[in-house]
Each structure stands twice: as C-alpha cells, then as structure tokens.
Amino acid sequence: MPGVETIKSSWADEVELDYGGLPPTTETVENGQKYVTEYKYNKDDKKTKVVRTYKISKQVVPKTVAKRRTWTKFGDSKNDKPGPNSQTTMVSEEIIMQFLNSKEDEKANDPLLDPTKNIAKCRICNGEHWSVNCPYKGTAMDTNMMEKKASAAAAAAVDAPKSGKYVPPFLKDSQKGALGMRGRDDTAAIRISNLSESMTEADLEELVKKIGPQSKMYLARDKNTGLCKGFAYVHFKQRKDAAAAIEILNGHGYDHLILSVEWSKPQNN
C-alpha cells in the first residue's frame, strides 16, 4: 500500500501567511532623507510596494506650534508616530493669515494714503516735493519761473474781458494818475501776510523786486521789540505787476512759512 504523499507549499505562500497578508511598513533614515516603504493591494488585487522619500529639514517654529505637535493622537491615528500620516492626513500648501481690524482695512483702501502717490508739487520745478525744499530755489531756474508767471499774469490782466458794469475812474488801469481821497493810489497795492519775525525791508525788497517796479513798501514792526508783526504792504507802479505778485507769491514758501498774498483793502476815512 503506497504511502500518502506530503504536499509542500511554496516559500512565497509561507511568507505571506507569516506576515498576515502584507508586510509591515518600514522607515529608514539615510543622508538626511527618510524612506518609508509600505505594501498595499491595487485595483487588480495585486500586492504592490510603495516607497516614499521625505527630505528632513529643521525649522524654528513658535512654542505653541511645537507644543501642539506633542498632543496625543486619537481615532485612526492613535498609534501613529509624531507628524502627519499619509493614510489619514493630506498635507497641502501653507496658508498665512493676517487679521486686520476695520480701521486698518479702511486705511489700506484709502487712496490718499497710497505711498505711490505724492500730493506735494513744487511750484518751481514741478517736482514731487514742497517748494520750500526745492533744490533749485534761488537759482536761475527759480528766476525764470517767476518771470514766466509774471508775464502770464500780466497778459491775463491785460486780456481780461471788460464787463458792462460801471467802474470808478480811480479803479481803472488807464487812470494811473488819478488818486483817491487819501492822496494815494491803492489799486496796485497788495498785502503780504504770514511773514516771519526776522523779516526785514531788504528781504521784502528782494522778494518782490523781480516781479515789477514798486513805488512804496511798508513792513509792519512791533514798537517795543522792533520785530516784524507778520505782514507788509507793497505798492506797485502798475496794477498788472500787483496781479502777477499775487499769482506768484500766494502760497509760496518763504523762510519755512507759506505766504498769503491778497489785494490791499482800502481804509475807510
């Protein structure tokens, strides 16, 4: 009677039985990189081997972030090691959030606070700075600019359309010799305000001499201290020169102050 033949299984089947179907996941670290090897079944129910490579880098994080990484995991990740698990966690790009209150948001949308826009404009060189800080102040460029403005203002005064209203003779430009009741002509007089205390008659003459000839200048001074009281009167020989002076000097920066120039108001007797 023949003996029963022993049926031997292959070594691959024995290995598969020993590992319970799939080998365990392994991790190795070499040359600053971590290699994670895992096994799984694909759609065709075939065993596949997946190797993931991670680059190990060190970074400085806030204490709260480092403490949060030590929290005890739960659920499907209860037995996972520190760090994300590819089976349960999907790592996306880092998003940095910045919280703004309503006031900061309004300031951010305010076009007047746009640093790319400069509200300052020089009256001398048309640069993006105040006229007081102009590097060309007092140079030939400043002189030419004042002469051009004076010519333009004089031409505008001459070419101004005449209205049908009655104009007294002493107010007409053609009646330059006609004087008022006080014995002087104030039609070509201007008042310059916001002058500094250190202003002198020589400074006042230097300020207006390039615009046109003057017949009289008066700088108001304090009787006790002798310092300038902040205003002065200049009488030009021609009314068009006075108009040009108002056009040029009104709003002009002088001695760290912004001048205010207007027509001199006649005094009541």
From Swiss-Prot:
GO molecular function, one term: translation initiation factor activity
Biological process (GO), any one: mitotic cell cycle
Domain RRM: 188-266
GO cellular component term, pick one: eukaryotic 43S preinitiation complex
PTM annotation (Phosphoserine): residues: 198
Record keywords: Cytoplasm, Initiation factor, Phosphoprotein, Protein biosynthesis, RNA-binding
Superkingdom of this protein's organism: Eukaryota
Pfam families per UniProt: eIF3g, RRM_1
Location(s), subcellular: Cytoplasm
Family matches, as PANTHER family: EUKARYOTIC TRANSLATION INITIATION FACTOR 3 SUBUNIT G
Description of how the protein assembles with itself and partners: Component of the eukaryotic translation initiation factor 3 (eIF-3) complex. The eIF-3 complex interacts with pix.
Function comment: RNA-binding component of the eukaryotic translation initiation factor 3 (eIF-3) complex, which is involved in protein synthesis of a specialized repertoire of mRNAs and, together with other initiation factors, stimulates binding of mRNA and methionyl-tRNAi to the 40S ribosome. The eIF-3 complex specifically targets and initiates translation of a subset of mRNAs involved in cell proliferation. This subunit can bind 18S rRNA.
Family: Belongs to the eIF-3 subunit G family.
Protein name as annotated: Eukaryotic translation initiation factor 3 subunit G-1
Organism: Drosophila melanogaster
